[in-house]
Amino acid sequence: VVCSPTDTHAQIVQEAAAAGKHIFCEKPIDLSLDKIDKTIDAVEKANVKFMVGFNRRFDPNFLKVQETVSSGKIGKPHVLKITSRDPSPPPEEYIKTSGGIFMDMTIHDFDMARYLMDSEVSEVYARGKVLVDPVFERAGDWDTAVILLTFENGALGVIDNSRQAVYGYDQRVEVFGAEGMVMVDNNTPDTHIYFNRNGAHSALPLNFFMDRY
């Protein structure tokens, strides 16, 4: 199990493969495509099992979305929407070595987009801004991002990310197709809704990925 800092993943995986060990590695494998390719080559040469930690693929709710799309129940998929927002920013030292919002956070959404749509991405347009905390700008990163995807099957995708959602860990997915739509909302500790003269009140989303996934 490789869950060390990102810049050590590739070397450790290569050494584990050379030792004949099956490997589970936290994402990403590395920030360099060249090192990633060399690592994959080492794994294939060693003929060991290798898995990267994209935990959302095993979430029961997201699995239902994937099953619904792949079964054809909503027809040809047209638009995918993913909302992924953390409850609070990570420490500055982590930000500096994380590889940035796209490699550290959006990477899960890129994986989920390809998984749900069963199609590779042909075009990517992304914009990032610092709207939450100046610490991200000092680290050369962004804390807010919007990504537009075009898939090889012709569908479109939109991902929006933020490093801070004050109401909790915001994880939502929607796939709209020619014959219908499937969606997953946030998980909450309970589903009760309390109404009074000030409005409707319900539980906040689960705190973070440790609880959500």
Task: Give names to the regions the model predicted.
Residues 1-42:
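Beta-loop-alpha module in the N-terminal Rossmann-like domain of NAD(P)-dependent dehydrogenases
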Residues 2, 24-25, 50-52, 81, ...:
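Hydrophobic residues in well-ordered beta-strands that form the structural core
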Residues 11, 38, 64-67, 112, ...:
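Alpha-helical elements of Rossmann-like donor-binding domains used by nucleotide-donor carbohydrate transfer enzymes
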Residues 26-28, 54, 165:
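Short beta->alpha connector loops at strand-helix junctions that form conserved
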Residues 38-55, 67, 75-82:
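Rossmann-fold dehydrogenase core element
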Residues 55, 137, 173-213:
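C-terminal glycine/acidic-rich active-site capping loop/insertion
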